[in-house]
């Protein structure tokens, strides 16, 4: 989990590069002189984030690598958490026919036909969240490759998927 969380932190640096003012294909044509610098400085101040100007505007408008990379880092974190949740579910199975290696707290009534059974509801909930995050990353991956030539207009759906993942 620690390695996955470090990957998320590293991917954040790429997201701090702002590509505003590149116009349609990253040339900056018809953008007022100094616009990018002023806007990035103001966005950085208002958001309290360390935003910087994107140096390669053409690349950032045709490739959504930074968003896809952040999404995959979040997905990998979810994969790690999902694995831990699966282990908890299996280790807490029992009390008669399961592993019964650990006891987890009962969140609600267990089984009516198996007295004493505690359902691993929280671990199952974590699994469902992880599945959703993995699905969101699939959306980001398809959107990242859906660009055509110098422009990828799929950023809104990519950002929605990433924000949904970080909101879970």
Question: What does each model-identified segment do?
Answer:
Residues 2-140:
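Internal glycine-rich alpha/beta core junctions
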Residues 113-117, 136, 143-165:
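Hydrophobic alpha-helical bundle architecture
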């Amino acid at each position: 989990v620690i390695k996955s969380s470090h990957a998320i932190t590293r991917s954040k640096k790429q997201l701090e590069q702002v590509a505003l003012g590149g116009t349609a294909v990253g040339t900056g044509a018809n953008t007022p002189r100094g616009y990018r610098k002023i806007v990035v400085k103001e966005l950085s101040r208002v958001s309290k984030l360390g935003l910087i100007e994107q140096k390669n505007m053409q690349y950032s408008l045709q490739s959504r690598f930074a968003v896809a990379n952040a999404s995959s880092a979040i997905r990998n974190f979810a994969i790690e958490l999902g694995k831990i949740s699966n282990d908890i579910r299996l280790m807490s199975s029992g009390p008669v026919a399961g592993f019964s290696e650990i006891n987890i707290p009962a969140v609600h009534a267990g089984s009516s036909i198996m007295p004493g059974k505690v359902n691993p509801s929280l671990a199952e909930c974590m699994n469902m969240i992880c599945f959703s995050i993995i699905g969101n990353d699939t959306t980001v991956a398809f959107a990242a490759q859906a660009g055509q030539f110098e422009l990828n207009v799929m950023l809104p759906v990519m950002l929605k998927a990433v924000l949904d993942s970080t909101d879970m």
